[in-house]
């Protein structure tokens, strides 16, 4: 994923309405997004990204710097499918690439 411009976004809100609003705003930003997500909400986030950001490349990095570190790459739908019945374990860093052919609609300064 491109690193010339990225936005560290931390954790998304837990409440659905606030979460959807924040995610929609973040997806308008140019560059790569870096999010944190818990194992309890990672499949929810992947489902949301599969709907809102179908063609974007997503990287899931689990348990970074630990013995069972794992990094997966694909679309959100592909990554969601890879979990199937398995319960996700560990904390996740989620990287979301920008839309292909899109420079983004607003800058981070405009968003705040």
Predicted regions and their residues:
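Class I SAM-dependent methyltransferase SAM-binding "motif I" and its flanking Rossmann-like core
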Residues: 1-29
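A contiguous loop/helix-start segment that scaffolds small-molecule binding in enzyme catalytic cores
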Residues: 32, 36-112
């Amino acid at each position: 994923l491109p690193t010339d411009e990225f936005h560290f976004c931390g954790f998304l809100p837990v409440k659905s309405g606030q979460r959807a609003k924040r995610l929609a705003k973040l997806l308008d930003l140019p560059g790569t997004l870096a999010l944190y997500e818990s194992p309890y909400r990672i499949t929810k986030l992947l489902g949301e990204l599969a709907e809102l950001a179908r063609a974007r490349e997503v990287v899931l990095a689990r348990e970074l710097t630990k013995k069972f570190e794992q990094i997966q790459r694909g679309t959100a739908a592909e990554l969601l499918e890879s979990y199937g019945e398995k319960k996700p374990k560990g904390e996740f860093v989620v990287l979301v690439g920008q839309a292909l052919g899109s420079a983004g609609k607003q800058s981070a300064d405009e968003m705040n």
